[in-house]
Swiss-Prot record:
Keyword Ribonucleoprotein: no
GO molecular function: ATP binding; ATP hydrolysis activity; ATP-dependent protein folding chaperone; unfolded protein binding
InterPro entries, per database record: HATPase_C_sf (IPR036890), Heat_shock_protein_90_CS (IPR019805), HSP90_C (IPR037196), Hsp90_fam (IPR001404), Hsp90_N (IPR020575), Ribosomal_Su5_D2-typ_SF (IPR020568)
Domain of life, source organism: Bacteria
Subunit structure: Homodimer.
Designated name of the protein: Chaperone protein HtpG
Region (C): 545-621
Stretches for region A: 1-328
Sequence segments annotated as region (Disordered): 479-498
Encoding gene, per UniProt annotation: htpG
Function: Molecular chaperone. Has ATPase activity.
Main location: cytoplasm
Pfam families, per the entry: HATPase_c_3, HSP90
Length: 621
């Protein structure tokens, strides 16, 4: 027997150390991981056999067998699925989730409950075996191949791969050499109970080999859970299916089990998690909704089964209308799949709308977890934007709580027709922004946008149900006229501009190219000034994001709005009327302050510091 001793990847030792020291609070979950892997192996071969029937010749009835061997201190899990050759064993068991390993380690929090969720999600579930075993032996023969290989490790930095002369049929056998202190797992009653707990939803028959009777007892119903009537399924069975499918420790927040009959027939069993998934915004994230055709697993990768913005969904979709022999490539642009996707999207958004109305506190928690992903759909051309906006909620500056756009509209002041928002990184900073002080003083609400995606979707959704969605940074906002006619507004604007022309001209003269224009503000009530942009210009935060991403080179010049009721601005104006133009440094300081409040860079930080020091010195001397 030729043996090769190999070292695990560098990070594998860290993972194994976590397994050995019981990262899982519930050690028996190792059985869930191994049964799930065995079921996946059978599903993969079942799919391949549709086009390569010879792979299952003589053994087409898939099964999983669990055996407790007290005499040898072993628990053995055997399947007749796809199996592995030498290369597969090294790739799948010698490394951990390839690209996911570093992310797994990076995401460890030290909180055992949270870290439990990461194990399966990053593909390290097999290694949970080392929580109960001091040695693991894997024997496998790949479908369509003759050679048998053995992988063996004690979980201490290295493993051995060897070929074997053992008579062994297709599939994989995992023998766990149980630690002395964990020998309760060898008890047949406990072992059967554990297997039954984690297997009832598995579509592959699972047998327990009873040494005493020397026969096999089937422990599960071996029918896909989603094919059963909802009345036959307990809440616990739904929960266990979700946890096994998602490698999760939380319970699902929403369970959607539906049979769609008519032009397109399919069944969906979908879950919305109650906790945020670690990889929601990770570029290498995996899809967690599996496609089945007539109970045969097809794929959960590279298929457009659900829109990207609903990627937090977990579950299965089983189609009756797609042909079993369809290639994965043909699924990319398939009419039936597109109709299934549209039906699921409509169903999920309908469920979310109901939850938003019936359970607002629960919905707030859901939104904190997944709202950022959901809003990405507002940037996609194929989305029904109005339906999606109906389930969106945002922070209200006036009421300091999450509200929907429909609730915002219900709170319109008489004559108001515009939805106002302000975007930024921090809701507390936004609340103190000069941009919204005037609106709030008139009890006109402002929605606070703090997700990066907000700056994108508002560019393609300029209105909702006939009401404009407008940034509070726009120059044309007049809080006194926000609920009045545009004709009245234009008259008052002209009067203000004429009255303070000497003031705005003076600021333009001092600031030069640093500003695009200087105007009298119709939205400031206490602050001296603020930056603003014209109706056609890019929002300030959006521009800053594009500069950070090197999509544009430089920031554009902004409008500076002045508050003539502010004491500082009033002093400058009175000085001008007295023919005193000695406030250049103060003008520059006001502009610098406005830039800082908007997160814009100050043109000359040294000069800004000197101006500030000079003014402080004058004040105290």
């Amino acid at each position: 027997m030729k043996q090769e001793k190999k070292k695990f990847d560098a990070e594998v030792g860290k993972i194994l150390n976590l397994m050995i020291h019981s990262l899982y609070s519930n050690k028996e979950i190792f059985m869930r991981e191994l049964i799930s892997n065995a079921s996946d192996a059978c599903d993969k071969l079942r799919y391949l056999s549709q086009s390569e029937a010879e792979l299952v010749a003589g053994d087409s009835n898939f099964k999983i067998t669990v055996k407790g061997d007290k005499n040898n201190g072993q628990v053995i899990i055997r399947d007749n699925g796809i199996g592995m050759n030498k290369e597969d064993l090294i790739e799948n068991l010698g490394t951990i989730a390839r690209s996911g390993t570093a992310n797994f380690l990076k995401n460890l929090s030290g909180d055992s409950k949270k870290d439990n969720m990461l194990i399966g999600q990053f593909g390290v579930g097999f290694y949970s075996s080392f929580m109960v075993a001091d040695k693991v032996t894997v024997t496998s023969r790949k479908a369509g191949e003759d050679k048998v290989y053995v992988w063996e490790s004690e979980g201490e930095g290295e493993y051995i791969v060897s070929n074997s002369d053992r008579e062994f049929s297709r599939g994989t056998e995992i023998a766990l050499h149980i630690k002395k202190e964990e020998d309760s797992f060898l008890d047949h009653f406990r072992l059967k109970h554990i297997v039954k707990s984690y297997s009832d939803h598995i579509a592959v028959p699972i047998y327990f080999f009873d040494e005493g009777d020397n026969n096999e007892i089937q422990l599960n119903s071996a029918s896909a859970l989603w094919t059963r009537s909802k009345s036959e399924i307990t809440e616990e069975q739904y929960k266990e299916f979700y946890k096994s499918l998602s490698y999760a420790v939380d319970d699902p927040w929403v369970t959607m089990h539906n049979k769609n009959e008519g032009a397109i027939e399919f069944t969906n069993l979908l879950f919305i998690p109650s906790s945020k998934t670690y990889d929601l915004f990770h570029p290498d994230r995996k899809r967690r909704v599996k496609l089945y055709i007539k109970r045969v697993f097809i794929s959960d990768e590279n298929i457009d089964l659900i829109p990207s913005y609903l990627r937090f969904l977990r579950g299965v979709v089983d189609s009756e209308d797609l042909p079993l022999n369809i290639s994965r490539e043909s699924l990319q642009h398939n009419n039936v799949l597109e109709k299934i996707k549209n039906a699921i999207t409509k169903r999920v958004l309908g469920e979310l709308k109901k939850k938003k109305e019936d359970s607002p506190d629960e919905y707030n928690n859901f939104w904190a977890n997944f709202g950022g992903a959901l809003k990405e759909g507002l940037c996609e051309a194929t989305t029904d934007h109005e339906k999606l906006l109906e389930v969106c909620i945002f922070r209200s500056a006036l009421h300091n709580k999450m509200i929907s756009l429909d609730e915002y509209i219900k709170g319109f002041k008489e004559g108001q027709n515009t939805i106002y928002y302000l975007s930024g990184d921090n809701p507390d900073k936004l609340l103190s922004s000069p941009q919204i002080e005037g609106l709030l003083s008139k009890n006109i609400d402002v929605l606070l946008f703090t997700d990066t995606v907000d700056d994108f979707w508002v560019n393609v959704n300029s209105e909702y149900k006939g009401h404009a969605i407008k940034s509070a940074t726009r120059s044309d906002i007049d809080v006194d006229q926000a609920t009045s006619s545009s004709e009245e507004k234009n008259k008052d604007d002209k009067k203000s501009d004429d009255e303070y022309k000497s003031l705005t001209d003076y600021f333009k003269e001092v600031l030069g190219i640093l500003v695009k224009d200087v105007k009298i503000s119709k939205k400031l009530t206490s602050s001296p000034a603020c930056l603003a942009v014209s109706e056609a210009a890019m929002d300030i935060r959006m521009e800053r994001f594009l500069i950070e991403q090197k999509q544009i080179a430089n920031a554009s010049a902004k409008n500076l709005e002045l508050n003539p009721k502010n004491k500082i601005i009033e002093k400058i104006f009175n000085d001008l009327k007295a023919n005193n133009k000695n406030n250049e440094e103060l003008v520059k300081l006001i502009f610098d302050q406005a830039c800082i409040l908007e997160g814009e860079p100050v043109a000359d930080t040294g000069a800004f510091s000197k101006r500030l020091n000079d003014i402080v010195q004058k004040a105290i001397l």
